[in-house]
């Protein structure tokens, strides 16, 4: 119920029109797992980063903000995990990696090429498990982190 209310409020936020529209479009598309790789690659090819983020968020049951942070982080480890969690194949991940490296000079295409085997070695199930806390509400995630820190102290 809380998530539905937050989505409803986000849809009415004037400052987030593009993001809200991308989320609505991704929901309307309702990409099936076999359609997702092509849609993600095509959205980046068309320079529709907001749609790419929304499609990824929907596929992984993440908030748009979490998915955006993952995609825009120049250290792309979480992105590669997210793409594996969505069960993307080598060709799709390579196309996405190349597109992001071409668009952002901070991303190193040679380093990405060196990582592709390691990326593909991670199973989709292991990637989903590694990212599982990201689908939780941000306040709940923060509370979990505080508990973990308190236990370590």
Functional labels for PLM-detected ranges:
Residues 1-153:
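Alpha-helical scaffold segments
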């Amino acid at each position: 119920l809380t998530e539905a209310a937050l989505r409803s409020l986000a849809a009415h936020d004037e400052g987030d029109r593009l993001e809200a529209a991308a989320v609505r479009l991704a929901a309307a598309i309702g990409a099936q797992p076999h359609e997702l790789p092509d849609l993600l690659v095509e959205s980046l090819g068309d320079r529709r980063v907001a749609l790419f983020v929304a499609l990824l968020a929907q596929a992984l049951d993440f908030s748009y903000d979490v998915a955006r942070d993952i995609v825009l982080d120049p250290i792309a480890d979480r992105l590669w995990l997210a793409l594996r969690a969505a069960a993307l194949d080598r060709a799709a991940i390579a196309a996405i990696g190349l597109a992001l490296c071409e668009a952002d000079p901070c991303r190193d295409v040679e380093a990405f090429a060196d990582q592709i085997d390691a990326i593909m070695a991670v199973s989709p199930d292991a990637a989903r498990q590694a990212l599982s806390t990201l689908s939780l509400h941000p306040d709940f995630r923060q509370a979990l982190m505080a508990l973990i820190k308190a236990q370590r102290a």
